[in-house]
UniProtKB/Swiss-Prot annotation:
The modification N-acetylalanine is found at A2. Its main location: nucleus. This is Mediator of RNA polymerase II transcription subunit 31. Component of the Mediator complex, a coactivator involved in the regulated transcription of nearly all RNA polymerase II-dependent genes. Mediator functions as a bridge to convey information from gene-specific regulatory proteins to the basal RNA polymerase II transcription machinery. Mediator is recruited to promoters by direct interactions with regulatory proteins and serves as a scaffold for the assembly of a functional preinitiation complex with RNA polymerase II and the general transcription factors. The lineage of its organism: Eukaryota, Metazoa, Chordata, Craniata, Vertebrata.
């Protein structure tokens, strides 16, 4: 009985840890949040930097599939570099990253729509010639 209760407690704890780490990793996609962390000295704390290194397991497909903002993995990768962490103190750096993300999303959406339209046209042609 006690073992079952302990197991349930472990499962609940693991689930909570998973949710908290998922939420935190996704917050890393926000350049303004990264700037906030840098200005408050979190990136100078060796324990925090080690925690960021630990979080690299989110790059594994079994975990990455839960991410809503995949660009957070790129930011997590960049945060492994001290130079990048130091640059984030500068608000202009965060603003530049933010602008680059917006440009990427805009062009990605357009490219994706064009590719989808081309694929749909190709399928229509294949269906028409196959009949």
């Amino acid at each position: 009985m006690a073992a079952a209760v302990a197991m349930e407690t472990d499962d609940a704890g693991n689930r909570l840890r998973f949710q908290l780490e998922l939420e935190f990793v996704q917050c890393l996609a926000n350049p303004n949040y990264l700037n906030f962390l840098a200005q408050r000295g979190y990136f100078k704390d060796k324990a925090f930097v080690n925690y960021l290194k630990y979080l690299l397991y989110w790059k594994e497909p079994e975990y990455a599939k839960y991410l809503k903002y995949p660009q957070c993995l790129h930011m997590l990768e960049l945060l492994q570099y001290e130079h990048f962490r130091k640059e984030l103190v500068n608000a202009q750096c965060a603003k530049f990253i933010d602008e680059q993300q917006i440009l990427h999303w805009q062009h990605y959406s357009r490219k994706r729509m064009r590719l989808q339209q081309a694929l749909a046209e190709q399928q229509q042609q294949n269906n028409a010639s196959g009949k």
